[in-house]
Amino acid sequence: MYSFEFVKAKTVAEAVKALKREDAQALGGGQTLIPTLRSRLASPSALVSLNGIAEMIGVCVTDDGMLAIGGATPHAVVAKEAKKHYPALAALAGNIGDPAVRSRGTIGGSLANNDPAACYPSAV
């Protein structure tokens, strides 16, 4: 790999500020981005870690009955927490990859990658 700055954002505001840098990339679970970096198919100037931003993790039902899922929520959490309200989404999340991928990969990363063969982009 090559040199880049690593930014560990603690809040959404910090992440947004860091991502305004030229060629900065958001890093969640890294299931797609890390192999892309290793293959030298991307060369961001900075990686902005979204891990640990509490407001980006979790699943809840809003006052108007909508399911809200934070972008940094791992697939395994989506599978567990969405089961009561959206069983099809929970089943989809529970069958992504293997347990290691489900515990590390995130719904936001999957949607941001927008691979047409991936599960979430076709479901949402």
Enumerate the language-model features and the residues they cover:
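C-terminal structural segment of proteins
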Residues: 1-124
